[in-house]
């Protein structure tokens, strides 16, 4: 993790690291002379997705809509994603929605906060987690090995991410994802994410308020 300029500690808290990079054959192998640290304290807010969850459920066939959550860093995307996973996994009796098998791609350990194989956050009773693995590989492994109904993944944006999402969608798996951006226009400037937008992969897009953490700005249906 240090080579990616962060470490995740118990509880899903993340420490960003900058300093002098040690590079070998074009790859960062260490960071020396650390000059700054940025602490991001994880918090679970049970029920924070209740305001949007009904819009994400397809009650006609007891499934979920492919969803993208958009906001700048630090505005609550991961917190909302985590609670959506919990709701989808447990099921929502008032909506007549039975729980789904959810595969969580937790590359940086911020969603489930796994500790010795046990999630420290409540992510639901039907949830499988792969952590500390690059997102594309983890998505493919979950689809092949765990038969998820839904894949959840934080901070997508690379060409490899998009390829893995295409693979999951073609396998009949639904997806809940997050991406950095202030609005859809900003997201569409990412050439890879624009491909997913142009294909209309996302059936729901949630925009969070960039000025008030965790506050919903709008949902595109």
Specify the residue positions occupied by each region the protein language model found.
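P-loop NTP-binding catalytic core
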Residues: 1-63
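Conserved P-loop NTPase
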Residues: 10, 24-33, 203-221
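Hydrophobic anchor at the beta1->P-loop junction of P-loop NTPases
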Residues: 67-69
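The conserved Walker
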Residues: 73-74
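Conserved lysine of the Walker
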Residues: 77
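Hydrophobic positions on the alpha1 helix immediately C-terminal to the Walker A/P-loop
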Residues: 80, 84
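P-loop NTPase switch/communication element
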Residues: 89-139
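Conserved P-loop NTPase nucleotide-binding/switch module
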Residues: 146-206, 210
């Amino acid at each position: 993790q240090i080579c990616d300029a962060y470490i995740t500690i118990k509880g899903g808290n993340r420490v960003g690291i900058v300093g002098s990079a040690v590079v070998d054959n074009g790859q960062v192998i260490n960071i020396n002379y650390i000059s700054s640290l940025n602490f991001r304290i994880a918090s679970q807010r049970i029920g924070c997705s209740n305001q949007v969850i009904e819009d994400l459920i397809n009650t006609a066939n007891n499934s979920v809509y492919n969803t993208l959550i958009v906001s700048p860093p630090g505005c609550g995307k991961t917190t909302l994603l985590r609670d959506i996973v919990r709701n989808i996994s447990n099921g929502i009796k008032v909506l007549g929605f039975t729980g789904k098998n959810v595969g969580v791609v937790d590359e940086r350990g911020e969603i489930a906060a796994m500790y010795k194989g046990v999630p420290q956050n409540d992510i639901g009773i039907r949830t499988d987690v792969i952590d500390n693995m690059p997102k594309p590989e983890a998505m493919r492994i979950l689809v092949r090995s765990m038969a998820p109904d839904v894949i959840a993944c934080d901070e997508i944006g690379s060409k490899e991410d998009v390829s893995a999402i295409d693979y999951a969608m073609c396998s009949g798996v639904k997806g809940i994802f997050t991406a950095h951006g202030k609005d859809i226009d900003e997201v569409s400037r990412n050439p890879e994410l624009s491909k997913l937008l142009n294909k209309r992969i996302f059936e729901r897009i949630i925009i969070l308020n960039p000025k008030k953490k965790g506050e919903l700005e709008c949902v595109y249906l």
